[in-house]
From Swiss-Prot:
Component of the FTS/Hook/FHIP complex (FHF complex). The FHF complex may function to promote vesicle trafficking and/or fusion via the homotypic vesicular protein sorting complex (the HOPS complex). Contributes to the establishment and maintenance of centrosome function. May function in the positioning or formation of aggresomes, which are pericentriolar accumulations of misfolded proteins, proteasomes and chaperones. FHF complex promotes the distribution of AP-4 complex to the perinuclear area of the cell. Residues 1-546 are annotated as: Sufficient for interaction with microtubules. GO terms for molecular function: identical protein binding; microtubule binding. Residues 582-716 are annotated as: Sufficient for interaction with CNTRL. GO terms for cellular component: centrosome; cytosol; FHF complex; HOPS complex; microtubule; trans-Golgi network. The gene is Hook2. It is found in: Cytoplasm, Cytoskeleton, Microtubule organizing center, Centrosome; Cytoplasm; Cytoplasm, Cytoskeleton; Golgi apparatus, trans-Golgi network. GO terms for biological process: cytoplasmic microtubule organization; cytoskeleton-dependent intracellular transport; early endosome to late endosome transport; endosome organization; endosome to lysosome transport; lysosome organization; protein localization to perinuclear region of cytoplasm; protein transport. This is Protein Hook homolog 2. Residues 1-161, 533-716 are annotated as: Required for localization to the centrosome and induction of aggresome formation. Keywords: Coiled coil, Cytoplasm, Cytoskeleton, Golgi apparatus, Microtubule, Phosphoprotein, Protein transport, Transport. Expressed in brain, cerebellum, kidney, liver and heart, with highest levels in heart and kidney (at protein level).
Length: 716
């Protein structure tokens, strides 16, 4: 059956106006831009023809026919994809319109093909019942054209599904309703159509009665008018009424014949509905039985497969169980060995902890001894200093006593000389008193005494005065020289006493260090400790010094690198740099202190090494018991390391076996699930009814065309 595309375009335009979209759709020119068709498709399925797709169609409203053609191509592509992916109806090439003719010339024939595809999408979507009801509200001629277009589209899409062998010899109306519904709803639609026909018959019978009543009333009026009115007017009215009566009779006859035809058709449809219901019930029962048998077969097949897999799994589990028991026995043995080793380790740790506590006490006592030695050295230095001061004071006291005796003797001699001079002066004093009245002036008396004294005595007196002055000067010089010599002597004595005290302290410290080394050796021998070789101690100290030197060099390099990278900074940055420099200086001071401490340690180690040299001690200091303890400790450490390695290997092997078991169970479960999914997968749809069922029951995701574009395409 072929439908005129121009007539089809007009009817589909009438059907398209039932969607009430905003763009005009009254003429082919209105539809050439594609906007109205896009809005209609958006109403048909908003999830596929979504707002983004609609916005892409409505972006440019330019009158250019090339833009129209591009939009129509996009609409046609979306229609083909929707029919193929969602509805399961691939569009044949003969139904594809030429969009260039539509966009440029508004060709009604090509536009009819495009609207026919839109109609196919409308009657196959989820809201198809609503759109079919809209079609039923149109005029009869429009309904007829639309139904023929649907039949043509469905017939050319699935030619084998419309054969008389499958569906019987239905009339046009029943076949149209068949293509608009599914097999499950076919009987309901036929029954509904039968009820509609009955309602139409009732309406026609009522209309017939009304017409009969009206005919009787008209006849009465005609009879009265013949009596009352003039003959000419009556004849005209009579002719008019006769013609109307004939028309009504013909209409009545036609309605009666159509009623009889409808009644016969209704009876035939009732029989067909009953037959179809019986066939449907039989087929439904058979399909249910077949499905039940198929499900039972699938379950039995799955159960047998699962039983085989479980048997294989059981055998492997039994084998693994034997291996696991062997491993448990080995683990139990290892645990017992580990328990013994742990107990031995605990005892050794206890001994080591006691040795550590004794070593800590020894270190504390050694520090106390060192502090007391330092205090004793300070007190000894103070005592030597005070002793030296006391000796100096005693010598000074002796010198002062001798000087006092010398001064006393000199005083006595001067006192005698004074007495002699006083006696010599008493002789002329009498003469001076006798002649006082003659010359009362004292200057005259003195001159007179000087003249009376003998010349020898006067010369002796002058000589004694000069000698006295010279002796006083010589005594002052001798006293200064004596004081200087005494000062040098005191300094030399002080240095000598200091050196003697330092020598005594060094000798005492050396003896104390030797005693400490001997005590340390005895303590290590008693505790079973491990005495390090002097060369090993020296090597360790050298390593520490080397590490300290390397750290100092690294710090110096970092400081130089920081100075090279230092940019011009503000006050806050300068303050930060100063803080960093202070911290670096502190670290340098700490490093220097550490280096000084290591140097002291090196000095002490050297003294210890010197004390431990064969020249100063007998060669048999290390006893055989000490060697025995050292070898036992080494063997014990070796056994502990071996046990730790065995335990780590067993733990790793157990973890690997557990991971292998878990992965095997997981792989087996995934394989069973995959096989069950393949067995329960539905057979490929080969008929139109199966395609309709799959299309109706398809569940599309929220993403619409983006989600469905990822689904595999159906093969027909």
């Amino acid at each position: 059956m072929s439908v005129d595309k121009a007539e089809l375009c007009g009817s589909l335009l009438t059907w398209l106006q039932t969607f009430q979209v905003s763009p005009p759709c009254a003429s082919p020119q209105d539809l050439s831009s594609g906007l109205a068709i896009a809005h209609v498709l958006n109403q048909i399925d908003p999830s596929w023809f979504n707002n983004e797709w609609l916005q892409g169609i409505s972006e440019d409203s330019s009158p250019s026919w090339r833009l129209k053609v591009r939009k129509l191509e996009k609409i046609l592509q979306s229609l083909v994809e929707y029919s193929k992916n969602v509805l399961g109806h691939p569009v044949s090439d003969q139904h594809l319109p030429d969009v260039s003719l539509i966009g440029e010339f508004s060709n009604p024939a090509e536009l009819g093909k495009l609207l026919q595809l839109v109609l196919g999408c409308a009657i196959s979507c989820e809201k198809k019942q609503e759109y079919i009801q809209r079609i039923m509200t149109l005029e009869e001629s429009v309904q007829h054209v639309v139904m023929e277009a649907i039949q043509e589209l469905m017939t050319k899409d699935t030619p084998d599904s419309l054969s008389p062998e499958n569906y019987g010899n239905f009339d046009t109306q029943s076949r149209r309703y068949y293509f608009l519904s599914e097999e499950v709803e076919e009987g309901d639609h036929l029954q509904q159509h039968y009820l509609d026909l009955e309602r139409q018959l009732l309406l026609l019978s009522e209309e017939k009665q009304n017409l009969a009543q009206e005919n009787a009333a008209l006849r009465e009026r005609v009879g009265r008018s013949e009596v009352e009115s003039a003959p000419g007017l009556t004849a005209k009215k009579l002719l008019l009424l006769q013609s109307q009566l004939e028309q009504l009779q013909e209409e009545n006859f036609r309605l009666e014949s159509s009623r009889e035809d409808d009644r016969l058709r209704c009876l035939e449809l009732e029989r067909e509905v009953a037959e179809l219901q019986q066939r449907n019930q039989a087929l439904t029962s058979l399909s249910q039985e077949a499905q039940a048998l198929k499900d039972e077969m699938d379950e039995l097949r799955q159960s047998s497969e699962r039983a085989r897999q479980l048997e294989a799994t059981l055998n492997s589990c039994r084998r693994r169980l034997g291996e696991l028991q062997e491993l448990r026995r080995q683990v139990r043995q290892l645990e017992e060995r580990n328990a013994g080793h742990a107990e031995r380790t605990r005892q050794l740790e206890e001994e080591l902890r006691r040795a550590g506590s004794l070593r800590a006490q020894l270190e504390a006592q050694r520090r106390q001894v060192q502090e007391l030695q330092g205090q004793w050295q300070e007190e000894a230095m103070k005592a030597e200093k005070w002793l030296f001061e006391c000796r100096n004071l005693e010598e000074k006291c002796d010198l002062v006593t001798k000087e006092k005796e010398r001064l006393l003797t000199e005083r006595d001699s001067l006192r005698e000389a004074n007495e002699e001079l006083r006696c010599a002066q008493l002789q002329p004093r009498g003469l001076a008193q006798a002649d006082l009245s003659l010359d009362p002036t004292p200057s005259g008396l003195e001159n007179l005494a000087a003249e009376i004294l003998p010349a020898e005595l006067r010369e002796t007196l002058v000589r004694l005065q000069l000698e006295n002055k010279r002796l006083c000067q010589q005594e002052a010089a001798d006293r200064e020289r004596q004081e200087e010599l005494q000062r040098h002597l005191e300094e030399a004595n002080r240095a000598r006493h200091g050196l003697e005290a330092q020598q005594r302290l060094n000798q005492q410290q050396l003896s104390e260090l030797r005693a400490q080394v001997e005590e340390l050796q005895k303590a290590l021998q008693e505790q079973g400790g491990k005495t390090e070789d002097p060369t090993l101690l020296k090597r360790k100290l050298e390593d520490h010094l080397q590490k300290l030197h390397e750290a100092d060099l690294e710090l110096q390099r970092k400081r130089e690198y920081i100075e090279e990278l230092e940019p011009p900074t503000d006050s806050s940055t300068a303050r930060r740099i100063e803080e960093l420099q202070d911290s670096l200086q502190k670290k340098d001071a700490d490093l220097r202190a550490m280096e000084e401490r290591y140097r002291r340690y090196v000095d002490k180690a050297r003294t210890v090494i010197q004390t431990l040299e064969p020249k100063q001690r007998p060669p048999t200091v290390v006893s055989p018991e000490f060697h025995t303890l050292r070898s036992q400790l080494w063997e014990r450490n070796l056994r502990i390391r071996q046990m730790e390695m065995d335990y780590e290997k067993s733990r790793r092997r157990q973890e690997q076996e557990e991971k292998l078991l878990i992965s095997a169970w997981y792989s087996m479960g995934m394989a069973l699930e995959h096989r069950a999914g393949e067995e329960h997968a539905p057979a490929h749809a080969q008929s139109f009814l199966a395609q309709q069922r799959l299309a109706t029951n398809a569940r599309r995701g929220p993403l619409g065309r983006q989600a469905l574009s990822l689904r595999p395409t159906d093969k027909h």
